[in-house]
């Protein structure tokens, strides 16, 4: 039998006492009182912060939104089917944040930045708060560089600049998403990173957008954030902020970004649902009182940064759906007042075959020609004026049968200009092609053609000038101006192609 000496025992005890580490963990916990409809009411959690993440016993995460005197209203970031009444909840001490990195490019993720495209995990070393403050006045500079959409009607008359917020508004099925996706396609080779946020849409619609971007190689510079119609309201409400956080990551790294929110009406509806279930008082159209703040704090994050911060930019194209053209409803008026202009898509124009169905009369860009190259300013002014006069004359001509020759000519010119603005989906044009197209129309070269021949002629003209007069594109891209030399090359090219075209049509 081994005998232990007393001093050995005391040494062992001393060592153990020295190794003892007194660690006290204070956890702020509470108990579930009630759960249902994506909302949980928690008793306890006395020191929880507004917007703090809380974790339920079975692993679901929630956000503490309502801090009341006797309980806390938590919105769930999941279905919460396994949460039981009386189970415990603990505060995490964290606010919602997502991992960010270049590896997100080309991926489809959800509002929590988890991949949903079945292509494995995304590696990220940094993270950003989902809700971070917008850049201040000193951090910004005014918008001065163009962001080309590839659509003649927009780039000439409603120009968008890098760092601008331009609302796309219209009824359902008027081509709002098509305008947004065309803009993404047109950013190829422009060093612009695109983020497309789909909120409360059909999964089939999102899949269609992703497929069209993949087919044209646009997913290489695009991130898709999707929360479909079957997602919890909390995640639909968070999705735009997740997209903004990803775009901000690139903006602060001196890059240009474009973010599309498709659409903010659905986000407002999700927020209304959450607010009513949390028993917040309803306001106009049953939306809560802070629905304006919901959108303003999101859209204010779009900016053109100052030269000290690297001149990165984040351009936002929010989409809002109207009911039978009513732009005076609550959400449309809110977003119109926050943004720097709106592109109004009309169902009547869409049904009349004018696509993109942009109503140029009430669409406006408040940044205006500051975001256009000089060559575009030179040709776009005349186009705007002629179309405005045509719209006025067309309304007048309906009541009068005997019109003088000058009026008839102006109406004929207007019809051809309207034809010139029509474009197929997913066929964006370069700025040089747009300039030559507008110049052809405003200088009367299309007046001798039948309306049905206009688009065919313009397609052939663009091909002819690209192959036979490459110097025109070179002058425009290098000087950004329609110089006398460029104009004479263009005139020559149009004359040659017009003669060839008329000859072909006669045969």
Curated annotation (Swiss-Prot):
It is a peripheral membrane protein. It holds the Pfam family ATP-synt_ab_N. The record marks 363 as: Required for activity. Its main location: plastid. It is found in: Plastid, Chloroplast thylakoid membrane. F-type ATPases have 2 components, CF(1) - the catalytic core - and CF(0) - the membrane proton channel. CF(1) has five subunits: alpha(3), beta(3), gamma(1), delta(1), epsilon(1). CF(0) has four main subunits: a, b, b' and c. Produces ATP from ADP in the presence of a proton gradient across the membrane. The alpha chain is a regulatory subunit. Belongs to the ATPase alpha/beta chains family. This is ATP synthase subunit alpha, chloroplastic. The gene is atpA.
């Amino acid at each position: 039998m081994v005998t232990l000496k007393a001093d050995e025992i005391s040494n062992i005890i001393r060592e153990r006492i020295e190794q003892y580490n007194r660690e006290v963990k204070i956890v702020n916990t509470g108990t579930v009182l009630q759960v249902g409809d994506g909302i949980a009411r928690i008793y306890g959690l006395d020191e929880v912060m507004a917007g703090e993440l809380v974790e339920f016993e079975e692993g679901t995460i929630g956000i503490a939104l309502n801090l009341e005197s006797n309980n806390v209203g938590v919105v769930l970031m999941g279905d919460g089917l396994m949460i039981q009444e009386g189970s415990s909840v603990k505060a995490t001490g964290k606010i919602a944040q997502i991992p960010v990195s270049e590896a997100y490019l080309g991926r489809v993720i959800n509002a929590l930045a988890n991949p949903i495209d079945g292509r494995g995990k995304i590696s990220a070393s940094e993270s950003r708060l989902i809700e971070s403050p917008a850049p201040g006045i000193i951090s910004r500079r005014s918008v001065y560089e163009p962001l080309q959409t590839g659509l003649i009607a927009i780039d000439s008359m409603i120009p968008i600049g890098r760092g601008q917020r331009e609302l796309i508004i219209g009824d359902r099925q008027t081509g709002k998403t098509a305008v947004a996706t065309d803009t993404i396609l047109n950013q190829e080779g422009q060093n612009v990173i695109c983020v497309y946020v789909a909120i409360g849409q059909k999964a089939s619609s999102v899949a269609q957008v992703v497929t069209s971007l993949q087919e044209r190689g646009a997913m290489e510079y695009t991130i898709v954030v999707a929360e479909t119609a079957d997602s919890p309201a909390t995640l639909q409400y968070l999705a735009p902020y997740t997209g903004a956080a990803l775009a901000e990551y690139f903006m602060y790294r001196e890059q240009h970004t474009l973010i599309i929110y498709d659409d903010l009406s659905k986000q407002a509806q999700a927020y209304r649902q959450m607010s009513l279930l949390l028993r917040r008082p309803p306001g106009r159209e049953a939306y809560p009182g802070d629905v304006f703040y919901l959108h303003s704090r999101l859209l204010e994050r779009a900016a053109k940064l100052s030269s000290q911060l690297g001149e990165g930019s984040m351009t936002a194209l929010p989409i809002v759906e109207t009911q039978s053209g009513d732009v005076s409803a609550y959400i449309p008026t809110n977003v119109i007042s926050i943004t720097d202009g709106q592109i109004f898509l009309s169902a009547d124009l869409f049904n009349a075959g004018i696509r993109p169905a942009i109503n140029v009369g009430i669409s406006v860009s408040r940044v205006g020609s500051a975001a256009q190259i000089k060559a575009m300013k030179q040709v776009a002014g005349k186009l705007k004026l002629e179309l405005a006069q045509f719209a006025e004359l067309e309304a007048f001509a309906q009541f009068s049968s005997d019109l003088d020759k000058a009026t008839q000519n102006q109406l004929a010119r207007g019809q051809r200009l309207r034809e010139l603005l029509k474009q197929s989906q997913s066929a964006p044009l370069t700025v040089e092609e747009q300039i030559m197209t507008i110049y052809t129309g405003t200088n009367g070269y299309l007046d001798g053609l039948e309306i049905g021949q206009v688009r065919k002629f313009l397609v052939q003209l663009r091909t002819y000038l690209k192959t036979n007069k490459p110097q025109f594109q070179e002058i425009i891209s290098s000087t950004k101006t329609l110089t006398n030399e460029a104009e004479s090359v263009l005139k020559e090219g149009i004359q040659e192609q017009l003669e060839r075209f008329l000859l072909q049509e006669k045969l």
